[in-house]
C-alpha cells in the first residue's frame, strides 16, 4: 500500500488512488460561436432529481474551458462501450473533433453524439471555481437513453466494458 508524507508524494498517491475508482466516460459538448466544441470528462455526477441537476468539472488549462464559459447549454454524452474511438478523439486537444463522428443538435442546440448510451442536455446555472478546475452545475432539460447500449467504464488508466474487459485499442 502506498502512503505519502510530503506534497509531491501525496499528489502521486492521490492520482494512484483515483485510478482505482471506476467512472463512466462522458463527452461534454456545446455549440459555441465557432461551432461545436467538446471534451472527454470523467468528473461527472448527478446532483439532484428535484430539479434534475448534474455536475461536471473541467480543468482551467483545457482548451475547451473558455468555450464552455461562453455558453449556457451543454450536452453530457455518456459514451457506450463501442465508442472507444470517440473517447480517444475527445481526450486530446486540438483538431475538429466532430468531423469524424456522427452527431446532431439536440433540443437545446448542444451536440448529441449518436451511439451514446445516454445523454443529458442541460442549462448551465452555476459555475464554481475549485482550485485548478471549474465545477459546472446544469439543470437537465432533456435526457434520453439508448436501449441495449452499455456504458464505457474508465479505471486504472484504461477504458473497459462493464464486465471489466479492456476495450479494443484502449489505453
Tell me the role of every PLM-derived stretch.
Residues 1-171:
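Basic, polyanion-binding surface patches
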Amino acid at each position: 500500500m502506498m502512503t505519502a508524507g510530503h506534497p509531491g508524494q501525496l499528489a502521486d498517491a492521490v492520482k494512484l488512488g483515483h485510478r482505482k475508482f471506476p467512472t463512466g466516460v462522458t463527452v461534454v459538448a456545446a455549440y459555441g460561436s465557432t461551432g461545436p466544441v467538446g471534451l472527454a470528462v470523467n468528473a461527472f455526477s448527478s446532483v439532484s432529481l428535484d430539479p434534475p441537476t448534474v455536475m461536471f468539472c473541467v480543468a482551467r488549462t483545457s482548451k475547451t474551458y473558455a468555450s464552455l464559459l461562453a455558453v449556457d447549454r451543454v450536452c453530457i454524452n455518456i459514451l457506450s462501450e463501442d465508442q472507444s474511438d470517440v473517447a480517444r478523439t475527445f481526450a486530446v486537444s486540438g483538431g475538429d473533433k466532430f468531423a469524424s463522428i456522427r452527431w446532431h443538435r439536440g433540443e437545446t442546440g448542444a451536440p448529441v453524439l449518436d451511439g451514446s448510451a445516454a445523454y443529458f442536455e442541460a442549462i448551465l446555472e452555476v459555475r464554481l471555481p475549485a482550485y485548478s478546475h471549474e465545477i459546472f452545475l446544469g439543470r437537465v432539460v432533456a435526457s434520453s437513453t439508448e436501449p441495449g447500449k452499455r456504458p464505457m467504464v474508465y479505471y486504472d488508466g484504461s477504458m473497459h466494458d462493464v464486465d471489466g474487459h479492456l476495450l479494443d485499442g484502449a489505453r
